[in-house]
Regions:
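Long, low-complexity, intrinsically disordered cytosolic termini of multi-pass membrane proteins
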Residues: 437-465
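Hydrophobic, small-residue-rich membrane helices and short re-entrant helix-turn-helix hairpins
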Residues: 186-198, 291-301
């Protein structure tokens, strides 16, 4: 064995013992917890604590990114493939997570709200857990002959996976937006002086369930994925977490709905609340409610990320066609993987054109971007389960079940995002929408009835101007 081979063997042994991506999972959990707590405290009166936690999450995220980047570089060195990060499904997961973290950090730098850190933590944790569930006996396995070309692996595959990255980031930003929208429904439901209608109660109940249900689903997903692979996580943990958190979420949401429907809310002294006053149970959500500034920021973030997703997906798909022409003698063959790639391009382009044409605004973009998660997951993993085509890697029950659960969760969040605006718009907008239509403005009537000023008065007004 040459000295170079010996050094590489020692490097691989150290890499396997340290398990850098396993360390990243714990660090991403810390980032997400700090970001979530910071965002919640920033929405209350403890803004200084919220800002401190947000900055702490950023520093932990920087450290985690260093570990994640170092692990990718070590893998590249061990495989002797310069500038090639993706060689199999496992490496695609860890690379997509790396891209999501960088994009989240950029968003946090531009919009220091804690949202970028939270999305980076969620996606970094999720992708590394997915990668761990995709591990085989050897994650540095040999490449298939048809894929053994560094140029196309460094261009087409990298660009396409970065398109996946941007699409997922836009989708998870949209999920956070829907979460805040649900908090807005709860807040405005209590501040609306009108008696609740049946539709209002249904929307209020769905929002109250969603504002606690979305975090619960994320927690259950991560616990299930961890229990499936990590020996130190007992198999009953996901069910225990689901029962405990689900019960707490149902109790909280049911309590809010009872207060809204029964009009029995009281203050700390036990006295009935005045009309439009928030009960104590709903105050934690009041600061999370959307306002004009938050809606504008989320619209800018989701739109900007979708632009990058469209560009990267389009360029990557075209490069894939050129590679297919060189390898298989045809540019396009309607292979399931190729269809999945073009679906991402078409869907992201559809969202952008809908916005440019004024057909949708921030909420519409968010709901459509959530379905982009469904399409992206289908292109990434779903097409591999069909067992046909040149990109199929065989059916995997874990991937099939995981994709199905993920798709259902995105459809539920989309449903919450489509709560009618009349139930979550601000009180001012509700009053404006309910105001009677006046064909002749009052100002014109007053102007017509007012006495006509004389010439001298008109001249004086002109001189003042």
């Amino acid at each position: 064995m040459t000295p170079t081979e010996l050094a590489k063997s020692r490097l691989e042994t150290t890499y396997n013992r340290f398990a850098p991506f396993m360390q990243c999972i714990a660090l991403y959990v810390i980032v997400f917890v700090l970001s979530a707590l910071g965002f919640i405290l920033s929405a209350t009166e403890k803004k200084a604590w919220g800002e401190a936690l947000r900055r702490s999450a950023s520093w932990v995220l920087y450290a985690t990114l260093i570990v994640h980047t170092g692990a990718l570089l070590v893998r590249m060195s061990l495989m002797d493939r310069p500038f090639v990060f993706v060689t199999n499904l496992y490496s695609s997961a860890v690379f997509i997570g790396w891209g999501c973290v960088i994009l989240g950090m950029v968003l946090e730098r531009i919009f220091p709200l804690g949202v970028g850190n939270a999305v980076a933590g969620i996606l970094g944790m999720a992708t590394t857990i997915v990668a761990h569930n995709l591990t085989t006996d050897d994650t540095l396995e040999m490449m298939e002959a048809v894929l053994d070309t560094n140029f196309w692996l460094a261009t087409h595959v990298t660009t396409v996976t970065l398109g996946y990255t941007a699409t997922f980031v836009a989708g998870f930003l949209s999920a956070v937006y829907v979460l805040l929208l649900c908090a807005t429904v709860v807040k405005d439901g209590f501040t609306d002086p009108k008696p609740p209608s049946l539709g209002g109660l249904l929307s209020f109940g769905a929002a109250a369930g969603g504002v606690v249900g979305i975090p619960m689903v994320l927690l259950w997903f991560f616990c299930t994925a961890a229990a499936a692979k990590f020996e130190w996580v007992h198999s009953s943990i996901p069910m225990v977490v689901l029962v405990v958190t689900g019960g707490a979420a149902a109790f909280y949401a049911g309590g809010l709905l009872f207060l809204k429907a029964g009009d029995v809310a009281v203050d700390a002294d036990g006295k009935p609340l005045a009309t439009g006053q928030l009960p104590a149970a709903a105050k934690p959500l009041a600061g999370m409610a959307l306002d004009a500034d938050k809606v504008k920021v989320f619209g800018q973030m989701i739109y900007g990320v979708l632009c990058f997703a469209t560009l990267l997906s389009f360029v990557g798909t075209v490069l894939g066609g050129i590679w297919a022409d060189q390898s298989w003698g045809r540019f396009w063959g309607w292979d399931p993987k190729e269809n999945g790639a073009v679906l991402i391009v078409l869907w992201n382009a559809l969202i952008l054109h809908a916005r440019w044409c004024g057909m949708v605004k921030t909420r519409g973009i968010a709901v459509l971007a959530l379905f982009g998660n469904v399409i992206c997951a289908w292109s990434w993993f779903g097409t591999n389960q069909l067992g046909i085509g040149l990109h199929a890697y065989g059916f995997d029950t874990r991937l099939a079940d995981g994709c199905t659960n993920f798709w259902l969760s995105q459809l539920v969040i989309m449903g919450l995002g489509m709560i009618p605006a009349v139930y979550w718009a601000s009180a001012t907008r509700r009053r404006a929408a309910a105001a009677p239509v006046v064909l002749v403005p009052v100002a014109l009537i007053e102007e017509a009835l007012a006495p006509t000023p004389g010439p001298s008065v008109v001249k004086k007004k002109k001189r003042k101007k």
